[in-house]
């Protein structure tokens, strides 16, 4: 996700509407917006069309109407996307969706992160790590687990904009720097 300020504002606006209607609507808006944004992300031609000023708003709205129908978007998300078309912001849908997802996670008390290991962890070990992190954070954590043999050993935990690098590769790098400095 980029630092697109307009995308953040639009996401907050849709989120505020959803908050007034309840958590179920927040989830529904998130699902609908995600389906539309995914279609834009997966189709470079669609993204180019939405960015291209040579196409009129009416032409973009016609394509958008078909997209919204295929995605099963409700009235509120459809109106929201039509507003984006009027303002020339349809190309920002993926960024708007990403920020909306962050707002929704914060509302639900969910933290998303990634745990990178050198080898694939067994399910029991993954569950134990997740449970321990949830206990320390005091919140529910959604972890994606990935394998990167280049870290040699240990783990790298990425949560939000924070990274905890407890990998063997990082430790060896620190040792190398200390040797170079003569410590």
UniProtKB/Swiss-Prot annotation:
Keyword Ion transport assigned: yes
Membrane topology of the entry: Peripheral membrane protein
UniProt keyword terms in alphabetical order: ATP synthesis, Cell inner membrane, Cell membrane, CF(1), Hydrogen ion transport, Ion transport, Membrane, Transport
GO molecular function, one term: proton-transporting ATP synthase activity, rotational mechanism
Annotated compartments: Cell inner membrane
NCBIfam families cross-referenced by the UniProt entry: ATP_synt_delta (TIGR01145)
Recorded family membership: Belongs to the ATPase delta chain family.
Name the UniProt record assigns to this protein: ATP synthase subunit delta
Organism whose genome encodes this protein: Oleidesulfovibrio alaskensis (strain ATCC BAA-1058 / DSM 17464 / G20)
């Amino acid at each position: 996700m980029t630092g697109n300020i307009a995308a953040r504002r639009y996401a907050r606006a849709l989120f505020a509407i959803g908050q007034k209607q309840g958590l179920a609507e927040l989830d529904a808006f998130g699902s609908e917006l995600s389906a539309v944004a995914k279609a834009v992300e997966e189709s470079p031609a669609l993204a180019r069309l939405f960015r291209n000023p040579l196409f009129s708003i009416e032409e973009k709205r016609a394509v958008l109407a078909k997209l919204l129908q295929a995605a099963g978007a409700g009235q509120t998300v459809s109106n929201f996307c039509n507003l984006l078309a009027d303002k020339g912001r349809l190309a920002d849908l993926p960024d708007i969706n990403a920020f909306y997802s962050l707002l929704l996670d914060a509302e639900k008390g969910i933290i998303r992160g990634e745990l990178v290991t050198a080898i694939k962890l067994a399910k029991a070990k993954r569950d134990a790590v997740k449970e321990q992190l949830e206990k320390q954070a005091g919140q529910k954590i959604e972890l994606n687990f990935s394998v990167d043999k280049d870290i040699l050993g240990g783990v790298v935990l990425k949560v939000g904009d924070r990274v905890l690098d407890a990998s063997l590769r990082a430790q060896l790098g620190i040792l190398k720097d200390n040797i170079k400095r003569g410590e």
